[in-house]
């Protein structure tokens, strides 16, 4: 029998037919392995036929969530779908919701979570491709391909710059999508009325954000959770581009202060709390909000 044993949701590994919940795991020292339940949201494209599958396995102190997923896929369930690449928090591809919070699976230690059941879900705000993997294209659609890179004319006129780090794409952003998932406006959990062009709220007789969101999704099935808001990651990228290229101010502010830009931010600050790289996108959004110019339509 393999170390990882799949069970039905809520069933005990020892007696899967009983239907009783897993017995509590006794506290152990950090040096000891523990047997935990990993509860994974499974679904097809678009989140179809969503369900939770439980896997019981022994977890070592050094095991990350990604390590455990790899073991489940290799030893127990090769159909499990998730995204991973670098395994050291550089690529951002393994971002997911772990016990209800956006985290990187590769650097989240299982035992450090302190729960006997670890629940894994895909990021919100982005279309689900299958199980824990989401489609990042709606986020990247609002980030121009050349933002954050040196353009040929700059290289020819300035040569190699001092401090190459400032030319790194989006600075410390690893484009993981955690901020998009955590943002209540983007993920659909904020039901405050949408902002008007002047930044004020709609009256009680106007549609709520939820109603407007549903209308947008009815007309475009590929639309993200809140089709009106481009989200914190694109706005953070836009603010970085503004700092690098002040000559493009009007062009960029037309996007940032336009109908899908900063006016939809409700300052929940969830995006900054979720960021694993300390980018603090909420500050970038507020920087754009304080600027003058750009689109007002």
Q: What does each model-identified segment do?
A:
Residues 2-140, 164, 180, 184, ...:
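Iron-sulfur-associated redox domains of electron-transfer enzymes in respiratory
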Residues 63-78, 121-297:
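Ferredoxin-type iron-sulfur electron-transfer modules in oxidoreductases and energy-metabolism complexes
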């Amino acid at each position: 029998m393999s170390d990882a044993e799949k069970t039905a949701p809520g069933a005990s590994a020892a007696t899967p037919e009983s239907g009783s919940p897993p017995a509590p795991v006794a506290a152990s020292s950090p040096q000891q392995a523990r047997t935990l339940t990993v509860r994974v949201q499974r679904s097809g494209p678009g989140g179809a036929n969503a369900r939770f599958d439980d896997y019981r396995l022994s977890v070592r102190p050094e095991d990350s969530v990604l390590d455990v997923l790899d073991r489940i896929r290799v030893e127990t369930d090769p159909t499990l779908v998730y995204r991973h690449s670098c395994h050291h928090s550089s690529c951002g591809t393994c971002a997911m919701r772990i016990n209800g919070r956006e985290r990187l699976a590769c650097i989240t230690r299982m035992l450090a979570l302190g729960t006997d059941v670890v629940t894994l879900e895909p990021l919100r705000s982005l279309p689900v491709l299958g199980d824990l993997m989401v489609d990042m294209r709606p986020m990247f659609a609002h980030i121009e391909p050349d933002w954050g890179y040196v353009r040929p004319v700059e290289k020819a006129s300035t040569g190699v710059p001092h401090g190459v780090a400032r030319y790194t794409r989006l600075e410390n952003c690893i484009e993981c999508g955690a901020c998009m998932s955590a943002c209540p406006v983007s993920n659909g959990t904020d039901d405050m009325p949408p902002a008007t062009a002047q930044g004020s709220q709609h009256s009680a007789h106007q549609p709520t954000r939820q109603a407007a969101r549903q209308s947008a999704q009815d007309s475009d099935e590929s639309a993200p959770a809140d089709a009106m808001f481009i989200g914190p990651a694109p706005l953070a990228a836009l603010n970085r581009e503004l700092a690098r290229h002040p000559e493009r101010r009007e062009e960029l502010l037309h996007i940032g202060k336009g109908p899908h830009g900063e006016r939809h931010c409700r300052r929940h600050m969830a995006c900054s709390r979720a960021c694993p790289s300390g980018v603090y996108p909420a500050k970038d959004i507020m920087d754009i909000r304080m600027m003058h110019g750009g689109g007002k339509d």
